[in-house]
UniProtKB/Swiss-Prot annotation:
Residues 9-244 form the ATP-grasp domain. Transmembrane segments: none annotated. This is Succinate--CoA ligase [ADP-forming] subunit beta. GO terms for cellular component: cytosol; succinate-CoA ligase complex. ATP binds at K46, G53, R54, G55, V102, E107. Binds 1 Mg(2+) ion per subunit. Its cofactor is Mg(2+). The gene is sucC. It is an enzyme of class 6 (ligase). The keyword Secreted does not apply.
Amino acid sequence: MHLHEYQAKDLLTAYQLPIPPYHVATSVPEVETAIQAEQWKAGVVKAQVHAGGRGKNGGVVIAHSPEDLLAAADKLLHMQFSSNQTAGLSLPINKVLISPLVEIASEYYLAIVIDRKHRCPVIMLSKAGGVDIEEVAEKQPDQLLKMTLPSSGKIYGYQLRRIAKFMEWDQPIADQGNRIIRQLLQCFYEKDASLLEINPLVLTKDGSLVILDAKMTIDDNALYRHPQLADCYDPSQENIRDVLAKQLGLSYIALDGTIGCLVNGAGLAMSTLDILKLYGGSAANFLDVGGSASEKQIQEAISLVLSDKSVRVLFIHIFGGIMDCAVVASGLVSAMQGQKETIPTVIRLEGTNVDKGKDMIINAGIPCEFVTSMSEGAELAVQLSR
Protein backbone atom coordinates (compact mmCIF):
# COMPACT_ATOMS: atom_id res chain seq x y z
CA MET A 1 0.00 0.00 0.00
CA HIS A 2 1.44 3.33 -1.09
CA LEU A 3 1.25 6.27 1.30
CA HIS A 4 0.91 9.91 0.38
CA GLU A 5 3.78 12.18 1.34
CA TYR A 6 1.84 13.71 4.21
CA GLN A 7 0.91 10.27 5.54
CA ALA A 8 4.55 9.18 5.47
CA LYS A 9 5.54 12.39 7.24
CA ASP A 10 2.87 11.81 9.88
CA LEU A 11 4.47 8.43 10.64
CA LEU A 12 8.01 9.80 10.62
CA THR A 13 7.07 12.67 12.91
CA ALA A 14 6.08 10.11 15.54
CA TYR A 15 9.69 8.91 15.44
CA GLN A 16 10.97 12.41 16.25
CA LEU A 17 12.54 12.89 12.84
CA PRO A 18 13.41 16.42 11.65
CA ILE A 19 10.62 17.52 9.31
CA PRO A 20 9.66 21.16 8.63
CA PRO A 21 6.11 22.11 9.69
CA TYR A 22 3.44 21.26 7.14
CA HIS A 23 -0.30 21.44 6.64
CA VAL A 24 -2.57 19.35 4.43
CA ALA A 25 -5.54 20.95 2.70
CA THR A 26 -8.36 19.85 0.45
CA SER A 27 -9.52 23.35 -0.50
CA VAL A 28 -8.20 26.88 -0.95
CA PRO A 29 -9.94 28.15 2.23
CA GLU A 30 -8.09 25.46 4.21
CA VAL A 31 -4.82 26.62 2.66
CA GLU A 32 -5.62 30.20 3.61
CA THR A 33 -6.36 29.16 7.19
CA ALA A 34 -3.02 27.33 7.41
CA ILE A 35 -1.09 30.28 5.97
CA GLN A 36 -2.67 32.68 8.44
CA ALA A 37 -2.09 30.35 11.39
CA GLU A 38 1.61 29.91 10.54
CA GLN A 39 2.04 33.46 9.21
CA TRP A 40 3.89 32.11 6.19
CA LYS A 41 4.94 34.70 3.63
CA ALA A 42 6.32 32.10 1.20
CA GLY A 43 6.31 28.36 0.86
CA VAL A 44 5.94 25.31 -1.32
CA VAL A 45 2.70 23.66 -2.42
CA LYS A 46 2.92 19.96 -3.30
CA ALA A 47 0.33 17.77 -4.98
CA GLN A 48 -0.46 14.65 -2.96
CA VAL A 49 -0.47 11.85 -5.50
CA HIS A 50 0.97 8.34 -5.64
CA ALA A 51 3.61 9.16 -8.24
CA GLY A 52 7.12 10.44 -8.58
CA GLY A 53 8.26 13.16 -10.93
CA ARG A 54 6.06 15.79 -9.33
CA GLY A 55 8.70 18.49 -9.57
CA LYS A 56 9.24 17.97 -13.29
CA ASN A 57 5.54 17.77 -14.12
CA GLY A 58 4.01 20.73 -12.33
CA GLY A 59 3.11 18.95 -9.11
CA VAL A 60 5.37 21.07 -6.90
CA VAL A 61 5.06 24.86 -6.91
CA ILE A 62 7.30 27.30 -5.04
CA ALA A 63 5.45 30.46 -4.05
CA HIS A 64 6.95 33.70 -2.77
CA SER A 65 3.83 35.35 -1.38
CA PRO A 66 0.60 34.31 0.37
CA GLU A 67 -1.31 35.17 -2.80
CA ASP A 68 0.93 32.90 -4.86
CA LEU A 69 0.46 30.09 -2.33
CA LEU A 70 -3.31 30.33 -2.69
CA ALA A 71 -3.11 30.50 -6.48
CA ALA A 72 -0.83 27.46 -6.62
CA ALA A 73 -3.12 25.45 -4.36
CA ASP A 74 -6.17 26.40 -6.42
CA LYS A 75 -4.42 25.34 -9.63
CA LEU A 76 -3.23 21.99 -8.27
CA LEU A 77 -6.55 21.08 -6.69
CA HIS A 78 -8.25 21.51 -10.06
CA MET A 79 -5.85 19.47 -12.19
CA GLN A 80 -5.09 15.85 -12.97
CA PHE A 81 -1.49 14.72 -12.54
CA SER A 82 0.42 12.45 -14.89
CA SER A 83 4.07 11.56 -15.32
CA ASN A 84 6.16 8.69 -16.63
CA GLN A 85 5.42 6.96 -13.31
CA THR A 86 1.61 6.99 -13.51
CA ALA A 87 1.35 4.18 -16.10
CA GLY A 88 -0.75 6.30 -18.43
CA LEU A 89 -3.23 7.31 -15.73
CA SER A 90 -4.19 10.86 -14.85
CA LEU A 91 -4.40 10.96 -11.07
CA PRO A 92 -6.75 13.34 -9.25
CA ILE A 93 -5.15 15.76 -6.81
CA ASN A 94 -7.51 15.71 -3.84
CA LYS A 95 -5.08 17.20 -1.32
CA VAL A 96 -2.07 19.48 -1.25
CA LEU A 97 0.71 19.82 1.30
CA ILE A 98 1.91 23.30 2.24
CA SER A 99 5.25 23.86 3.91
CA PRO A 100 7.64 26.80 4.44
CA LEU A 101 10.70 27.28 2.26
CA VAL A 102 14.02 25.96 3.56
CA GLU A 103 17.44 27.46 2.84
CA ILE A 104 19.28 24.53 1.30
CA ALA A 105 23.04 24.07 1.30
CA SER A 106 23.14 20.47 0.00
CA GLU A 107 20.66 17.81 -1.10
CA TYR A 108 21.04 14.07 -0.49
CA TYR A 109 19.20 10.88 -1.35
CA LEU A 110 18.45 8.19 1.25
CA ALA A 111 16.29 5.11 0.90
CA ILE A 112 15.67 1.82 2.65
CA VAL A 113 14.15 -0.84 0.43
CA ILE A 114 13.67 -4.59 0.28
CA ASP A 115 16.20 -6.12 -2.11
CA ARG A 116 14.33 -9.15 -3.45
CA LYS A 117 17.43 -10.58 -5.12
CA HIS A 118 19.37 -10.75 -1.86
CA ARG A 119 16.22 -11.20 0.27
CA CYS A 120 17.12 -8.50 2.77
CA PRO A 121 16.72 -4.76 3.34
CA VAL A 122 19.30 -2.46 1.82
CA ILE A 123 20.11 1.18 2.45
CA MET A 124 21.00 3.43 -0.47
CA LEU A 125 22.51 6.90 -0.26
CA SER A 126 23.76 9.49 -2.69
CA LYS A 127 25.11 13.03 -2.57
CA ALA A 128 23.00 13.68 -5.67
CA GLY A 129 19.63 14.25 -4.02
CA GLY A 130 16.56 15.99 -5.33
CA VAL A 131 16.86 14.33 -8.76
CA ASP A 132 15.74 11.07 -10.35
CA ILE A 133 17.87 8.48 -8.60
CA GLU A 134 17.40 6.11 -11.55
CA GLU A 135 19.44 8.51 -13.71
CA VAL A 136 22.17 8.67 -11.09
CA ALA A 137 22.32 4.87 -10.83
CA GLU A 138 22.55 4.53 -14.61
CA LYS A 139 24.90 7.38 -15.50
CA GLN A 140 26.93 7.82 -12.29
CA PRO A 141 26.81 4.53 -10.37
CA ASP A 142 29.83 5.58 -8.31
CA GLN A 143 27.62 8.31 -6.81
CA LEU A 144 25.32 5.73 -5.20
CA LEU A 145 26.23 3.79 -2.05
CA LYS A 146 24.30 0.57 -1.44
CA MET A 147 24.68 -1.63 1.65
CA THR A 148 22.76 -4.65 2.89
CA LEU A 149 21.33 -4.43 6.39
CA PRO A 150 21.17 -7.08 9.13
CA SER A 151 17.84 -8.78 9.75
CA SER A 152 17.92 -7.51 13.34
CA GLY A 153 16.71 -4.11 12.17
CA LYS A 154 19.87 -2.43 13.40
CA ILE A 155 22.80 -0.91 11.54
CA TYR A 156 26.41 -1.51 12.48
CA GLY A 157 28.78 1.23 13.57
CA TYR A 158 31.21 0.55 10.74
CA GLN A 159 28.35 0.99 8.25
CA LEU A 160 27.50 4.39 9.70
CA ARG A 161 31.16 5.42 9.49
CA ARG A 162 31.28 4.29 5.87
CA ILE A 163 28.15 6.32 5.12
CA ALA A 164 29.58 9.45 6.74
CA LYS A 165 32.79 9.11 4.73
CA PHE A 166 30.94 8.52 1.46
CA MET A 167 28.59 11.45 2.07
CA GLU A 168 31.50 13.68 3.18
CA TRP A 169 29.79 14.58 6.44
CA ASP A 170 31.84 16.10 9.23
CA GLN A 171 31.24 14.81 12.75
CA PRO A 172 28.37 17.16 13.76
CA ILE A 173 26.48 16.35 10.55
CA ALA A 174 27.35 12.64 10.81
CA ASP A 175 25.89 12.56 14.32
CA GLN A 176 22.61 13.94 12.94
CA GLY A 177 22.72 11.54 10.01
CA ASN A 178 23.31 8.54 12.28
CA ARG A 179 20.30 9.41 14.39
CA ILE A 180 18.10 9.94 11.33
CA ILE A 181 19.16 6.63 9.79
CA ARG A 182 18.52 4.72 13.01
CA GLN A 183 15.06 6.26 13.42
CA LEU A 184 14.19 5.61 9.78
CA LEU A 185 15.23 1.98 10.19
CA GLN A 186 13.08 1.63 13.28
CA CYS A 187 10.08 3.02 11.42
CA PHE A 188 10.80 0.82 8.38
CA TYR A 189 10.83 -2.37 10.44
CA GLU A 190 8.04 -1.54 12.88
CA LYS A 191 5.63 -0.50 10.12
CA ASP A 192 6.50 -3.44 7.83
CA ALA A 193 7.53 -1.13 5.01
CA SER A 194 8.92 -2.34 1.71
CA LEU A 195 10.13 1.14 0.76
CA LEU A 196 11.06 4.25 2.70
CA GLU A 197 12.59 6.91 0.48
CA ILE A 198 13.78 10.37 1.50
CA ASN A 199 14.47 12.55 -1.51
CA PRO A 200 15.71 14.99 -0.68
CA LEU A 201 17.31 14.84 2.72
CA VAL A 202 18.80 18.32 2.90
CA LEU A 203 21.53 20.09 4.80
CA THR A 204 20.30 23.58 5.62
CA LYS A 205 22.55 26.62 5.67
CA ASP A 206 22.54 26.55 9.48
CA GLY A 207 23.99 23.01 9.47
CA SER A 208 20.84 20.95 10.16
CA LEU A 209 19.78 17.80 8.34
CA VAL A 210 16.08 17.96 7.44
CA ILE A 211 13.67 15.63 5.64
CA LEU A 212 11.90 17.55 2.87
CA ASP A 213 10.12 14.71 1.08
CA ALA A 214 9.16 11.17 2.02
CA LYS A 215 7.78 8.24 0.06
CA MET A 216 6.66 5.09 1.86
CA THR A 217 5.12 1.77 0.87
CA ILE A 218 3.68 -0.70 3.38
CA ASP A 219 3.67 -4.44 2.67
CA ASP A 220 0.05 -5.38 1.92
CA ASN A 221 0.57 -8.77 3.54
CA ALA A 222 1.40 -7.11 6.86
CA LEU A 223 -1.50 -4.66 7.00
CA TYR A 224 -3.39 -6.88 9.42
CA ARG A 225 -0.76 -5.91 11.98
CA HIS A 226 -1.43 -2.21 11.40
CA PRO A 227 -5.19 -1.60 11.47
CA GLN A 228 -4.50 2.06 12.23
CA LEU A 229 -3.13 2.42 8.68
CA ALA A 230 -6.35 1.25 7.01
CA ASP A 231 -7.52 4.82 6.47
CA CYS A 232 -4.34 5.58 4.52
CA TYR A 233 -5.58 3.59 1.54
CA ASP A 234 -6.59 5.93 -1.29
CA PRO A 235 -8.44 4.12 -4.11
CA SER A 236 -8.61 7.31 -6.18
CA GLN A 237 -4.92 6.82 -6.97
CA GLU A 238 -5.39 3.41 -8.58
CA ASN A 239 -6.78 2.01 -11.79
CA ILE A 240 -10.49 1.36 -11.25
CA ARG A 241 -10.00 -2.30 -12.18
CA ASP A 242 -7.29 -2.66 -9.53
CA VAL A 243 -9.68 -1.26 -6.94
CA LEU A 244 -12.48 -3.60 -8.00
CA ALA A 245 -10.12 -6.59 -7.94
CA LYS A 246 -9.17 -5.82 -4.36
CA GLN A 247 -12.82 -5.65 -3.40
CA LEU A 248 -13.38 -9.04 -5.05
CA GLY A 249 -10.34 -10.58 -3.39
CA LEU A 250 -8.59 -11.26 -6.71
CA SER A 251 -4.88 -11.06 -7.49
CA TYR A 252 -5.03 -8.68 -10.46
CA ILE A 253 -2.41 -6.46 -12.07
CA ALA A 254 -3.20 -4.36 -15.13
CA LEU A 255 -0.66 -4.61 -17.96
CA ASP A 256 -0.40 -2.92 -21.34
CA GLY A 257 -1.10 -5.80 -23.74
CA THR A 258 -4.17 -6.94 -25.67
CA ILE A 259 -4.76 -10.50 -24.44
CA GLY A 260 -6.92 -10.76 -21.34
CA CYS A 261 -5.92 -13.65 -19.09
CA LEU A 262 -7.78 -15.62 -16.44
CA VAL A 263 -5.59 -18.27 -14.81
CA ASN A 264 -5.56 -20.24 -11.57
CA GLY A 265 -2.26 -20.26 -9.70
CA ALA A 266 0.41 -17.56 -9.69
CA GLY A 267 3.03 -19.83 -11.24
CA LEU A 268 0.79 -20.86 -14.12
CA ALA A 269 -0.29 -17.23 -14.57
CA MET A 270 3.31 -16.03 -14.89
CA SER A 271 4.13 -18.89 -17.27
CA THR A 272 1.13 -17.88 -19.36
CA LEU A 273 2.39 -14.30 -19.60
CA ASP A 274 5.82 -15.58 -20.62
CA ILE A 275 4.60 -17.89 -23.35
CA LEU A 276 2.33 -15.20 -24.81
CA LYS A 277 5.40 -13.00 -25.09
CA LEU A 278 7.33 -15.89 -26.64
CA TYR A 279 4.76 -16.11 -29.44
CA GLY A 280 4.87 -12.37 -30.05
CA GLY A 281 1.86 -11.25 -28.02
CA SER A 282 1.39 -9.45 -24.73
CA ALA A 283 -1.00 -9.86 -21.84
CA ALA A 284 -3.45 -7.16 -20.80
CA ASN A 285 -3.36 -8.34 -17.20
CA PHE A 286 -2.14 -10.77 -14.61
CA LEU A 287 -5.10 -12.46 -12.95
CA ASP A 288 -4.83 -15.39 -10.55
CA VAL A 289 -8.22 -16.60 -9.33
CA GLY A 290 -6.63 -19.15 -7.00
CA GLY A 291 -7.92 -22.62 -6.29
CA SER A 292 -11.11 -21.91 -4.38
CA ALA A 293 -12.86 -19.22 -6.43
CA SER A 294 -16.65 -19.43 -6.56
CA GLU A 295 -18.82 -19.23 -9.66
CA LYS A 296 -19.62 -15.62 -8.74
CA GLN A 297 -15.94 -14.72 -8.42
CA ILE A 298 -15.16 -16.29 -11.80
CA GLN A 299 -18.03 -14.37 -13.37
CA GLU A 300 -16.86 -11.09 -11.86
CA ALA A 301 -13.23 -11.82 -12.75
CA ILE A 302 -14.11 -12.34 -16.42
CA SER A 303 -16.27 -9.22 -16.44
CA LEU A 304 -13.36 -7.33 -14.89
CA VAL A 305 -10.97 -8.46 -17.63
CA LEU A 306 -13.46 -7.66 -20.39
CA SER A 307 -14.07 -4.16 -19.01
CA ASP A 308 -10.61 -3.27 -20.32
CA LYS A 309 -11.28 -1.95 -23.83
CA SER A 310 -7.75 -2.81 -24.95
CA VAL A 311 -8.52 -6.53 -24.60
CA ARG A 312 -8.97 -8.16 -28.02
CA VAL A 313 -8.81 -11.81 -26.97
CA LEU A 314 -9.69 -13.67 -23.77
CA PHE A 315 -7.40 -16.55 -22.82
CA ILE A 316 -8.76 -18.77 -20.03
CA HIS A 317 -6.10 -21.14 -18.77
CA ILE A 318 -7.21 -23.44 -15.96
CA PHE A 319 -5.50 -26.49 -14.51
CA GLY A 320 -8.17 -27.91 -12.25
CA GLY A 321 -6.56 -29.64 -9.34
CA ILE A 322 -8.29 -27.92 -6.47
CA MET A 323 -10.26 -25.72 -8.86
CA ASP A 324 -13.38 -27.34 -10.35
CA CYS A 325 -13.54 -26.80 -14.12
CA ALA A 326 -17.35 -26.92 -13.96
CA VAL A 327 -17.32 -23.93 -11.62
CA VAL A 328 -15.10 -22.04 -14.07
CA ALA A 329 -17.42 -22.95 -16.93
CA SER A 330 -20.50 -21.83 -15.03
CA GLY A 331 -18.88 -18.50 -14.18
CA LEU A 332 -17.79 -18.04 -17.80
CA VAL A 333 -21.30 -18.70 -19.12
CA SER A 334 -22.81 -16.20 -16.67
CA ALA A 335 -20.22 -13.57 -17.56
CA MET A 336 -20.54 -13.99 -21.32
CA GLN A 337 -24.32 -13.90 -21.25
CA GLY A 338 -24.09 -10.49 -19.63
CA GLN A 339 -21.81 -9.05 -22.33
CA LYS A 340 -23.23 -6.91 -25.14
CA GLU A 341 -20.35 -7.81 -27.44
CA THR A 342 -18.20 -10.91 -27.62
CA ILE A 343 -14.50 -11.20 -28.36
CA PRO A 344 -12.48 -14.24 -29.48
CA THR A 345 -12.03 -16.61 -26.55
CA VAL A 346 -9.41 -19.33 -26.18
CA ILE A 347 -9.92 -21.90 -23.43
CA ARG A 348 -7.65 -24.53 -22.00
CA LEU A 349 -9.35 -26.59 -19.30
CA GLU A 350 -7.65 -29.55 -17.66
CA GLY A 351 -8.43 -31.48 -14.50
CA THR A 352 -11.44 -31.91 -12.23
CA ASN A 353 -14.76 -32.10 -14.11
CA VAL A 354 -13.15 -30.93 -17.35
CA ASP A 355 -15.64 -32.77 -19.62
CA LYS A 356 -18.61 -31.44 -17.67
CA GLY A 357 -17.20 -27.92 -17.88
CA LYS A 358 -16.65 -28.10 -21.63
CA ASP A 359 -20.17 -29.45 -22.18
CA MET A 360 -21.63 -26.55 -20.18
CA ILE A 361 -19.79 -24.01 -22.34
CA ILE A 362 -20.74 -25.73 -25.61
CA ASN A 363 -24.40 -26.17 -24.62
CA ALA A 364 -24.62 -22.49 -23.67
CA GLY A 365 -23.50 -21.55 -27.17
CA ILE A 366 -20.49 -19.56 -26.02
CA PRO A 367 -18.27 -18.93 -29.08
CA CYS A 368 -14.78 -20.13 -28.20
CA GLU A 369 -11.82 -22.25 -29.23
CA PHE A 370 -10.76 -25.15 -27.01
CA VAL A 371 -7.06 -26.08 -26.92
CA THR A 372 -5.23 -28.94 -25.26
CA SER A 373 -1.87 -27.37 -24.43
CA MET A 374 -0.46 -24.10 -23.14
CA SER A 375 1.65 -23.51 -26.25
CA GLU A 376 -1.30 -24.18 -28.57
CA GLY A 377 -3.47 -21.79 -26.59
CA ALA A 378 -0.87 -19.05 -26.46
CA GLU A 379 -0.12 -19.27 -30.18
CA LEU A 380 -3.82 -19.12 -31.08
CA ALA A 381 -4.51 -16.24 -28.68
CA VAL A 382 -1.66 -14.22 -30.20
CA GLN A 383 -2.91 -14.90 -33.73
CA LEU A 384 -6.44 -13.81 -32.84
CA SER A 385 -5.18 -10.64 -31.15
CA ARG A 386 -3.67 -9.32 -34.37
